[in-house]
Amino acid sequence: MFKWLMSSLCGIRNSTSPEVYEPIIGGQNPATMLRLQSALAAVNALLPATLTIEDVISSADNTRRLVKAQTLARTYQACQHNIECLSRHRASSDNPNLNAVVTTHMINAKRLSDTCLAALMHLYLSVGAVDATTDTMVDHAIRMTAENSVVMADVAVLEKTLGLDPQATVRAQDLLALNSGVLNSVNAVAEMTDPTDDVEFTQSVHSPLLPRQLSTTEVVGVPSPVKSNLKSKHKPKRKASLVAV
């Protein structure tokens, strides 16, 4: 109190004032409740056990934890969207440098998303707390610069802290690239073969699947009667001959 009084009399103000959290009363501020519901929806989509507004507003620590968790959840969703967009890239020999850049971005985005998810789980489901490393992760997640080497170095530290295996991500990306290459090869073979050619090849003019069309030069032959080897028991009747008078 005395320090505050002396600083006020001398005109000295503390520029780095600590954050102040006011208690939230449900129904008093609709905008605040809407932001809380939006944050809970983003976080509950990744947590196995859903949180409620009562859990969040019960203490200032829970509110601060929700703010960190919302940033981690938004970053995870953004990384997943980037991975989905980058996976549509078709690797080609025309621009090999672009293929390497896309692969690097996919690996970094996958590592960042896995780290955000693990930090979020550790924030709510672990017994201990890693507030320092989580705060660092949140600061980097806000900047969203996964391609930066400094950020990826901090991600590597968090991976070691949270027990993640980045090599598994690289192997998964290699398997995805292999499956994409096989699918592209199958599609290329399918495009080279025309379905109409297959029909004409399997059902030609002489194919039993189609009726044979006669040309103008062919002569239609009348089938001759087949002589039977069986002898009839009845005697053939003789025709009456005409006698000229």
Curated annotation (Swiss-Prot):
Subcellular location: Virion tegument; Host cytoplasm; Host Golgi apparatus
InterPro entries, per the entry: Herpes_UL51
UniProt KW Lipoprotein keyword: yes
UniProt modification remark: Phosphorylated.
GO-annotated cellular components: host cell Golgi apparatus; viral tegument
Top-level division of the source organism's lineage: Viruses
Biased composition (Basic residues): 230-245
Record lipid sites (S-palmitoyl cysteine): C10
Spans through the membrane: none
Record key words, sorted: Host cytoplasm, Host Golgi apparatus, Lipoprotein, Palmitate, Phosphoprotein, Virion, Virion tegument
Region of interest (Disordered), residue spans: 225-245
Similarity-based family: Belongs to the herpesviridae UL51 family.
Biological function: Plays several roles during the time course of infection, including egress of virus particles from the perinuclear space and secondary envelopment of cytoplasmic capsids that bud into specific trans-Golgi network (TGN)-derived membranes.
Subunit structure, as described in the record: Oligomerizes. Interacts with ORF55; this interaction mediates ORF55 incorporation to virions.
Protein name: Tegument protein UL51 homolog
